[in-house]
From Swiss-Prot:
Disulfide bridges in this chain: none
UniProt-recorded name of the protein: Long chronological lifespan protein 2
Keywords noted in UniProt: Signal
InterPro entries from the UniProt entry: LCL2 (IPR034543)
Amino acid sequence: MLQSWRQALWALLLLVSVAQAQFNFFDQMFGGGEQQRQQQRSQNSPSDSDRYQQMWNGAQCDHYLCPGTLACVHFPHHCPCPHPDVEEKVELGEGSAVCVSKGGFKAGEAARKIELARKGLL
């Protein structure tokens, strides 16, 4: 008799744990994890520019201070791209340059497409 009670209790515990796991899955699946997402959102940096302004004001540069990277360079078109792993710098002439997404293309492909677009061929 004790053996059957033990088996029944074991089966009940197993059933409860499976049900709990199932409800946790559905809770996460259908928005029950909203509280966790809100906590993650609240940890993001605010969108004001005070921190950037402080870094800009504290930067030491005798030449040109790049606005996107705060790098100190001799000329504006020498500014590096903020995300060199995924961006390619393309010099447009007249001392200007732009950073464009590489988009998975081989090196120089973005520059070629920009040049074609400037000529009206793309």
